[in-house]
Amino acid sequence: MADETKTQIPKPTRQRGPMGRMGGMRRGEKAKDFKGTMRQLLGYIGQHKIAVFAAVAFAVCSVIFNIVGPKVLGQVTTKLFEGLVAKVNGTGDVDFDWIAKTLGFLLCLYLASSVCSLIQGWLMTGVTQKICYRMRKEIAAKIAVVPMSYFNGHSKGDVLSRITNDVDTLGQSLNQSVTQLITSVTQIIGVLVMMLSISLPLTGVTVLTLPAAAIILTVMIHFSQPYFREQQQVLGAVNGIIEEDFAGQNVIQVFDRAEASIEEFDRQNDRLFISGWRSQFLSGLMMPLMSLVGNMGYVGVVVVGAQLALTGNATPGDIQSFIQYVRNFTQPVQQLGNVSNTMQSMAAATERVFEFLAAPEEEQKADAQIPEKRPGHVEFDHVKFGYTPDKTIIHDFSCEAQPGQTIAIVGPTGAGKTTLIKLLQRFYDVDGGSLRVEGVDVRDWDRAALRGEFAMVLQDTWLFNDTIRENIRYGRPDATDAEVEAAARAARCDHFIHTLAGGYDFMINEEGTNLSQGQRQLVTIARAILADRPALILDEATSNVDTRTEELIQRAMDALMQGRTSFVIAHRLSTIRNADVILVIRDGDIVEKGTHDELLAQGGFYADLYNSQFDEAA
């Protein structure tokens, strides 16, 4: 960190444990655009105006009831003192009836203050939770429309951190900061008025401490800011490492990379710990220094108050009340320092949430088309595409798929096969040329309608934590149990399902690790069969199953592809011998095109690939 040399703060000894000793502490991080972020947040708060105004009113009432207390208590002290003096002089006695009634009134004031504070807290908790609920809901909806390119530039851990940690920080900080801000300002004004009503000289002594407090706040915030800025970002990186290590734990163990993984985590964890420790160390100095200033105010009040009492310009009750007010005056000033840190943290977390919500969405034309004719005719016309502007993957790709045809795409790893499928699904838009379905450019299609016409089976299976029945039904939620089981039989997975405990009600765990890779693939194929979409995308769907299972799947696939336009990316070339057209891709270009027999007869790149696979098998 470049800023570390600016302020010499000793590096703390790192504490082991999750995220070091500091854990996930992020308080005090400064937002890049504090004012802009707060304006956006006010838009969310404005949705709950009545509740917020009511909370403010109850907070003000609570403070007012609390502020009046020392004044009343001072009157009781004066009355008691005067009564005792009169009793000693034999001219009177202590008026305990008046004192009892006054103390009863004081008790009612404090009870009313507590009730108002309780109601205010209940209202603000409701407001903050509703705001967090709305933000999480908007984030969930946003994920569905954010382009794939966004996730290429952001780790899963970073996105999850925005959804969980940042929203939680917002909720906690908003509730705390709004309450403290309202009560602190109200208390400062109210206490100042009460102190002026008691003694102008004593008030002047107390107010003299404000410039010192302001200087301390400014200096501490200034020096702590450099260490606040990276905390939220580093936390996202830490979460990303944790998510990645958890998902790839088997690979880490197999390749004995646990130590390297721990070292990388420790490196990021050290950054989070050091920046968090230093920022909190500096901001933590604020309270002791503010207490020092407050104590100096006490000393000044005692000295001046004693002089006023000796000259008869102040009563003992006045001095006692004023000392209480001095404490009530310095406390909210200190709280404003905490509010400053809390609001900086809140703004930083909120800014990250708003950054995600403001991320570019997948373009959707207002007049997007939903063609009545089901897709079957697909045409790539001189398509050019690259994930980044400086690296083109697809250079000049052209091909045409007639309705019901099976188009097989083969080629070495990195040739651009899967990229073509992503373009067809419009996860990305082409950089040049056009891609048309039923004669309509996919950029003019309604995205949901376009994707809803394709069933997909990918090499990387995705199953969620639910029963096998519900995982298959995911392809068509309204399907009956009989239809689910029919799809499973077509995918040749009915037999192994019945061997599991519970059969179709067998619960798949997270990541689907209680099924074999081949079994998971069969379930995803059954899901695609049940979906019964007019077009199919099979991305090396049989590459993770054994030869016997592959034969079973292939027979099911042959029947499934009848009458449907199918795009098949194949690793095992033996599975695409019956394809209507085989496209051989290398470096983003078509180098060969034809049927299986035609390409073998040519003796080119495809023939070499095909023969090499059989040579390896032999």
Question: Could you tell me what each predicted segment is?
Answer:
Residues 1-66, 81-102, 119-124, 128, ...:
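Membrane-integrated ABC transporters
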Residues 47, 148-149, 167-174, 178, ...:
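An intracellular "coupling" helix at the cytosolic face of ABC transporter transmembrane type-1 domains
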Residues 20, 39-42, 50-75, 106, ...:
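Alpha-helical segments in transporter systems
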Residues 52-116, 196-201, 299, 310-316:
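Transmembrane helix-loop-helix hairpins at lipid-water interfaces of multipass membrane proteins
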Residues 2-6, 365, 371-618:
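ABC-type nucleotide-binding domain
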Residues 83, 194-208, 222, 278-351, ...:
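Helix-loop-helix
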Residues 47, 51-64, 75, 176-230, ...:
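Transmembrane helices of ABC transporter permease
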Residues 37, 45, 124, 142-189, ...:
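Juxtamembrane loop-to-helix connectors within ABC transporter transmembrane domains
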